[in-house]
A protein has these predicted regions:
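Flexible coil/loop and intrinsically disordered segments
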Residues: 1-274
């Protein structure tokens, strides 16, 4: 380690540049500030973010959810891609930045780095997990417009936690059981619809294994058991919650198209949020 410092930042001999050393130490202080106060931290119960603000602060919660979304959509090796966004604001603020300023800048950078792909590319075959997380963030952000204040659904959304261990799965299964009201024709049109954004959610592999190839009716009962408190835990996908909120009576090909178009419109609208 010392040899690396000696090569790139000499601290002894004739090549010492005191200004470079000072700049480096100041950068370390800023990085420590960003990590300790401005960077979301996973906890046993979700995530924590300091910013020297009360945990009930609305903008702090919004910033925490945005960073949580970015955290799960990156790996331990790619967090640096958006850590630099924090450093930019810390540097410009010459200390702890205003939470709203940090949120606005990070949201702007996310919009820039992740442009919305076409609807047709958001398929089962693609690596599109970011867009399911982003949609969940949009639903959480607009929860007061979407859900009734005292509804079980609102309680679920208020306590939603982003998690990494998620995979994209079908709502109406690829090979439905015989008692399912939803059946696929052996056509390219049905195959495309089956694998389209409207018929997909992102859930844990454990839940997917438990409900593998189960009918929509069985999955609806599963979601309802969370809403009425019969099962502990919570819904793993707010997109899935929207499906069962709006299509409690059944899931068919028209519903898949309608839901997919609406959710894609919400993704487009997410770029207008500031």
């Amino acid at each position: 380690m010392l040899s690396i410092f000696e090569e790139y930042l000499p601290f002894s001999g004739k090549n010492v540049n005191k200004q470079d050393i000072k700049d480096f130490m100041e950068t370390l202080v800023k990085a420590r500030l960003a990590l300790d106060i401005c960077f979301v931290r996973p906890t046993e119960y979700g995530y924590a973010l300091d910013m020297n603000l009360n945990e009930d602060n609305d903008i702090l919660k919004k910033l925490q959810m945005l960073q949580s979304m970015l955290y799960v959509s990156s790996s331990n090796y790619t967090n640096y891609r958006w850590f630099n966004w924090l450093m930019d604001v810390v540097d410009a603020s010459k200390g702890i930045p205003d939470a709203q300023r940090l949120y606005s800048y990070m949201k702007e950078k996310a919009d820039e780095v992740f442009p919305l792909p076409s609807y047709d590319t958001l398929t089962y075959q693609g690596d599109n997990r970011y867009w399911f997380w982003r949609l969940d963030f949009y639903i959480w952000l607009h929860r007061n417009e979407i859900f009734d204040k005292d509804s079980p659904e609102m309680d679920i959304v208020e306590n939603y936690i982003f998690k990494r261990n998620r995979s994209i799965e079908h709502i109406a299964p690829q090979t439905p059981q015989s008692n399912s009201m939803m059946q696929w024709d052996n056509t390219e049109t049905d195959k495309t619809l089956r694998d389209s954004f409207g018929n997909l959610v992102m859930i844990s592999q454990g839940l997917n294994s438990a409900l593998s190839n189960e009918s929509y009716e069985v999955k609806t009962a599963h979601v309802q058991s969370y809403c009425n408190g019969a099962k502990s835990g919570s819904i793993e996908s707010l997109k899935l919650l929207m499906v069962h909120k709006e299509y409690s009576k059944g899931w068919n090909k028209d519903a898949i198209k309608e839901h997919g178009e609406k959710m894609y419109d919400w993704l487009k609208a997410s770029f207008e949020d500031k």
